[in-house]
Amino acid sequence: MNTENLLKNNNVDHEEIAKFEAVASRWWDLEGEFKPLHRINPLRLGYIAERAGGLFGKKVLDVGCGGGILAESMAREGATVTGLDMGFEPLQVAKLHALESGIQVEYVQETVEEHAAKHAGQYDVVTCMEMLEHVPDPQSVVRACAQLVKPGGDVFFSTLNRNGKSWLMAVVGAEYILRMVPKGTHDVKKFIKPAELLGWVDQTSLKERHMTGLHYNPITNSFKLGPGVDVNYMLHTQNK
């Protein structure tokens, strides 16, 4: 393997991959470990579709697609979707579920850096949801996403802010008290401040268009989008 390919393959945290491999068979269990992803998916999909001016007929790449929850929902909107992930088991689950659902999605096991080297400028929309905090070099992912989108195309990121409140909500609350996600899912040191993400975006051809927070209300047990990016947040960018 040459140096360039080695670098492209290096942006993988194998411990993170193993976490999701272990629970991949339950990816589509609406009451399982991925219940929060199923519950927030309509919000994510709605935000992406609205900000991108619809998805019908567009070529879309979902980076870090896992078992295919978002990828399938975008395909249902009429998009031609490719899903990328480095986890073998999640991709097998995604392929099987798409087959059973009669949904056409192409799933590929490779890094976004590898994909960008072969498919630069080929996508109308690129999504990277809850993935940046699970790789060693998130800035490299941002660069690759910028390379993959067409001029004027849209790139969406979502991740977790790094602060005390985010640690309390996403780690202590979600993992240990409410048990919404498995213990050890998140590492607060890998969370990303909005200013950091915007700084990486500024070093690419992407331009910030909109940012919103994703909020959970434990009293009503509901999620909503709105102002405030102190815990979960989503960023819409557009290629210049």
From Swiss-Prot:
> Which SUPFAM superfamilies does this chain map to?
S-adenosyl-L-methionine-dependent methyltransferases
Q: Which UniProt keywords apply?
A: Methyltransferase, S-adenosyl-L-methionine, Transferase, Ubiquinone biosynthesis
Name any Gene Ontology BP term.
Answer: methylation
GO molecular-function annotation terms?
2-polyprenyl-6-hydroxyphenol methylase activity; 3-demethylubiquinol 3-O-methyltransferase activity; polyprenyldihydroxybenzoate methyltransferase activity
EC identifiers of the protein: 2.1.1.222, 2.1.1.64
Q: Which Pfam families match?
A: Methyltransf_23
Question: Hey, which pathway is this one from?
Answer: Cofactor biosynthesis; ubiquinone biosynthesis
Q: Does the keyword Transmembrane helix apply?
A: no
Q: Where does S-adenosyl-L-methionine bind?
A: 44, 64, 85, 129
Q: What EC class does the entry list?
A: transferase
The answer, when asked if Metal-binding is one of the entry's keywords, is no
Describe the reaction catalysed, as an equation.
a 3-demethylubiquinol + S-adenosyl-L-methionine = a ubiquinol + S-adenosyl-L-homocysteine + H(+); a 3-(all-trans-polyprenyl)benzene-1,2-diol + S-adenosyl-L-methionine = a 2-methoxy-6-(all-trans-polyprenyl)phenol + S-adenosyl-L-homocysteine + H(+)
InterPro entries documented for this protein: SAM-dependent_MTases_sf (IPR029063), UbiG_MeTrfase (IPR010233)
Q: What does this protein do?
A: O-methyltransferase that catalyzes the 2 O-methylation steps in the ubiquinone biosynthetic pathway.
The record's NCBIfam families line, in alphabetical order, gives: UbiG
Question: What PANTHER family does UniProt report for this protein, alphabetically?
Answer: METHYLTRANSFERASE, UBIQUINONE BIOSYNTHESIS O-METHYLTRANSFERASE, MITOCHONDRIAL
* Family of this protein: Belongs to the methyltransferase superfamily. UbiG/COQ3 family.
Entry protein name? Ubiquinone biosynthesis O-methyltransferase
